[in-house]
Swiss-Prot record:
CC annotations in GO: chloroplast; ribonucleoprotein complex; ribosome
UniProt organism field: Tupiella akineta (Green alga)
Keyword Chloroplast: yes
InterPro entries: Nucleotide-bd_a/b_plait_sf (IPR012677), Ribosomal_uL23-like (IPR013025), Ribosomal_uL23/eL15/eS24_sf (IPR012678)
Superkingdom of source: Eukaryota
GO biological process: translation
Name of this chain's protein: Large ribosomal subunit protein uL23c
Annotated keywords: Chloroplast, Plastid, Ribonucleoprotein, Ribosomal protein, RNA-binding, rRNA-binding
Subunit-structure text: Part of the 50S ribosomal subunit.
Functional summary from the UniProt entry: Binds to 23S rRNA.
Molecular function GO terms recorded: rRNA binding; structural constituent of ribosome
Length: 94
């Protein structure tokens, strides 16, 4: 189950969203919104109010003469209840 959540996103926008109890993660492309909700509720023992997702565009990658693409991934913005937090972000204030 932890393999489905790749890593938390740490950008200026994601830190602004934490104040609104919205956390941003990169997740597996094959996950649907109900599956993402179940993964986070089981993994972090929280109540998920909403899940917003979008697919980020692929980027070109060149190695010598070969041209390929970086793997595509999905970004999920998770909205949780006001009195709950996700433990990964608890030490981000220091």
């Amino acid at each position: 189950m932890i393999d489905l959540v790749k890593y938390p996103v740490s950008t200026e926008k994601s830190y602004r969203l934490i104040e609104k109890n919205q956390y941003t993660f990169d997740v597996d492309v094959r996950l649907t919104k109900p599956q993402i909700r179940k993964v986070f509720e089981n993994l972090f023992d929280i109540k998920v109010l909403a899940v917003n997702t979008h697919l980020l565009p692929t980027k070109k990658k060149r190695l010598g003469l070969n041209l390929g693409f970086k793997t595509r991934y999905k970004r999920a913005i998770i909205t949780i209840k006001a009195n709950q937090t996700i433990p990964i972000f608890e030490n981000s204030d220091s």
